[in-house]
Amino acid sequence: MRAYIFQDEGDQRKPNDSKIEVSAEDLEAAKVSYRHHDGDLHTFADGLMKEYGFKNRDEVVVSRKGLGDRYDNMVKKFFEEHLHEDEEIRLILDGNGYFDVRSVDDRWVRIFVEKGDLIILPPGIYHRFTTTTDDYIHAMRLFHENPKWIALSRTDSTSEELDARKSYLNSIKKSVYV
């Protein structure tokens, strides 16, 4: 995992690297959790299911080869700024991608993830996702309850009024990072 301030250079799938690093501690202050595992990832996921009380999981592959003509629209959809009312938990099984999360001062922090990385985004944090120029990621999604993926756009003014958003903002009020 590598995190840094995002600097828009046109193609969302490129690094867009400002060279301003963001530490794991800074991500923790934003309630973003990260772990890496080098062993068998399905066995690791079994342990996570028990450790965190996850009840469901599935796997998704986002690739130009697999999605064909639907690929560009799918990646565009994932890159729209949004939040969820539940945690977003992803274990990267293969390939790589970028999760962008909003900092306390509303800048984009880009997080590069690759095989073996586990990232947990808290409910209520604005974020987006894109593949890299490799155009391939295989991830496991873990859920506390039934699998669901409901994205609430930042352009929808009601997203700021959601309990998940309010709770998230209260949880980071005392945090000072990036």
Swiss-Prot record:
User: How many and how are cofactors bound here?
Assistant: Binds either 1 Fe or Ni cation per monomer. Iron-binding promotes an acireductone dioxygenase reaction producing 2-keto-4-methylthiobutyrate, while nickel-binding promotes an acireductone dioxygenase reaction producing 3-(methylsulfanyl)propanoate.
Entry cofactors: Fe(2+); Ni(2+)
Reactions catalysed, as given in the entry: 1,2-dihydroxy-5-(methylsulfanyl)pent-1-en-3-one + O2 = 4-methylsulfanyl-2-oxobutanoate + formate + 2 H(+); 1,2-dihydroxy-5-(methylsulfanyl)pent-1-en-3-one + O2 = 3-(methylsulfanyl)propanoate + CO + formate + 2 H(+)
Which GO BP terms, alphabetically? L-methionine salvage from methylthioadenosine; methionine metabolic process
Please state where this protein is localized. Cytoplasm; Nucleus
Q: Record's HAMAP family?
A: Salvage_MtnD_euk
Q: What family name appears in the similarity comment? A: Belongs to the acireductone dioxygenase (ARD) family.
User: Know the name of this protein?
Assistant: Acireductone dioxygenase
